[in-house]
Amino acid sequence: MKPIVCAIDAERIDEVWPLVEPHITIGVEAARGELTVYGVHQALVDGDMLLLMVYQEKKVIAALGLDITVHMSGKRTIGVTVCAGSQLDEWMVDIIEALDQLGAEMKCDAVVIIGRPGWTKKLAEHGYSRAYVAMSKEI
């Protein structure tokens, strides 16, 4: 059975939260202290982030938190702030299509995905290129 991607309205976050929280938690753990599970939940409930949920055969297999950024230039981007799941190869194309569609609906100019290096090769096959490199040092 093909995975299904659906956007969850802010009003329904608490209803689906027990199903997506394990995935969000994994994504937060990979965020190097920049996110918290509570903060992601609150942003979703407040409508400051959008939740995409991927499910297959009545089981959630991935969750993504998206946000819109309006840059100083006026450029609008839709970005993946947090993402985790299993069976990536089965749903990645569907997520890319959903990001393109949502971005267009929200009048965005680009999709921005910040992730680990392994994403670069997978996303290049779908028209993405490395925009910049971020480096970090704990102090």
Residue ranges with predicted function:
Residues I114, S129-I139:
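Conserved catalytic-core motifs of GNAT/GCN5-like acyltransferases
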Residues E29-M49:
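Active-site rim helix/loop that mediates acceptor-substrate recognition in acyltransferases
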Residues D48-M49, E125-S129:
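Short glycine-aromatic motifs
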Residues M1-L35:
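Short amphipathic alpha-helix that is part of the acyltransferase structural core
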Residues D48-D89:
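Conserved donor-binding loop and adjoining core beta-sheet/short helix segment
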Residues K75-A124:
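Acyl-donor binding region in acyl/amide transferases
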Residues A43-V45, E57, H71, A104, ...:
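Sterically constrained small-residue positions within well-ordered secondary structures
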